[in-house]
Amino acid sequence: EICACLVGSEMCIRDSMKRIVTLFLSLVLLLSCLCAPASAMFDPSLFYEVQAKSAYIVNTDTNIIVYDKDSSRQVSAGGLTKYMTIALLLTNYADQLDNTFQMPFAISDYVHNSDNADMRSNETFTYREAVYAMLLRNANEAAMGLAYSLSGGDLAGWVSQMNTLSQRIGTTGSTWTDACGLDSGNVTTAVDMYLILRYLMSFCLLYTSDAA
C-alpha cells in the first residue's frame, strides 16, 4: 500500500493501490478517505495504525511535511498509474476536454475482466468523461482507450511521454509501463505521488464538477 496526502484548506487525497480517493471542495470522489488535522507535529500513529508500507502527508497551506513513513520506498503503482495518464492528457489537451474519441475494440476486450466503467467498443466519449471514469471507477478501459486514441495506436509512445512528463514533474522513483496500471512494471513512491497530485491540482478540471 501507498498513501500520499495533501492536507490543508484545499484538499486531502489518500490512495491505497487501486483505490483512488479525491476530496476537493464540491468535487468528492470517495472510495476510502481519511482526513485529519495537519500540523508540524501530527503523528497519525497516535490515532490509528498506519498500515501503508509508505506514506507522505503535506500541509498544502504551509508546504510543511507533517508525516513521512518510508516515502521514498518504491512500490507497485497499480491504479495510481492513471494519475500520470490524466496528467499527460491535461498537459497536452487541457483546453480540448470536450473533444471525443471512439473506444477501440481491442482495448475494450483487453480490460474486460478488470476495473471498468462499461465503456464499450465503438462507443464515443469525451476526454472529460474518460477522466471522470478513471477517477470515479478506476476504469482501465478509459485510460487505455484514451491513450490509444490520442497516440494514434502508439501505446509505447504514450508511455514514453508519461515517463518524460513524470521526470519533468520531479519524480525520481517512478517508472510507467502502461496507461492504466495493469502491468506490474508500473512503480512509484509516496513522495512521487505527492508531486504528481500537486501538479494535477494546477488544472481547473479538478476544481469544478459542473461539467461532465
Language-model-detected regions and their locations in the chain:
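C-terminal segment of classical bacterial N-terminal signal peptides
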Residues: 31-38
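Single conserved hydrophobic/aromatic residue that forms the stacking wall/gate
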Residues: 1-15, 207-212
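Generic structural signal for beta-strand residues in well-ordered domains
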Residues: 4-5, 22, 48, 94
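Active-site-adjacent loops and short helices of periplasmic peptidoglycan-processing enzymes
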Residues: 40-191, 200-204
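Sec-dependent signal peptide recognition
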Residues: 18-26
